[in-house]
From Swiss-Prot:
Stated role: May control the interaction of photosystem II (PSII) cores with the light-harvesting antenna, regulates electron flow through the 2 photosystem reaction centers. PSII is a light-driven water plastoquinone oxidoreductase, using light energy to abstract electrons from H(2)O, generating a proton gradient subsequently used for ATP formation.
Cellular compartments annotated: Plastid, Chloroplast thylakoid membrane
Assigned GO CC terms: chloroplast thylakoid membrane; photosystem II reaction center
Principal subcellular localization: plastid
Lineage: Eukaryota, Viridiplantae, Streptophyta, Embryophyta, Tracheophyta
Organism for this UniProt entry: Glycine max
Name of the protein in question: Photosystem II reaction center protein Z
InterPro entries hit by this protein: PSII_PsbZ, PSII_PsbZ_sf
Length: 62
């Protein structure tokens, strides 16, 4: 269970870093938002899911 928690935290950190870089780039580029809207929404949905997963796994470990 600890390994799953550590992998979930690592994935959350990795996705956070990717979104931190990619979202401003998408907003700054011309026509970037209309072309990459689905990618940003998918990344945000994945991030929200990982936040809940880390919370659930944390409550099971503690």
């Amino acid at each position: 269970m600890t390994i799953a928690f550590q992998l979930a935290v690592f994935a959350l950190i990795a996705i956070s870093f990717i979104l931190l870089i990619s979202v401003p780039v998408v907003f700054a580029s011309p026509e970037g938002w209309s072309n990459n809207k689905n990618v940003v929404f998918s990344g945000t949905s994945l991030w929200i899911g990982l936040v809940f997963l880390v919370g659930i796994l944390n409550s099971l470990i503690s």
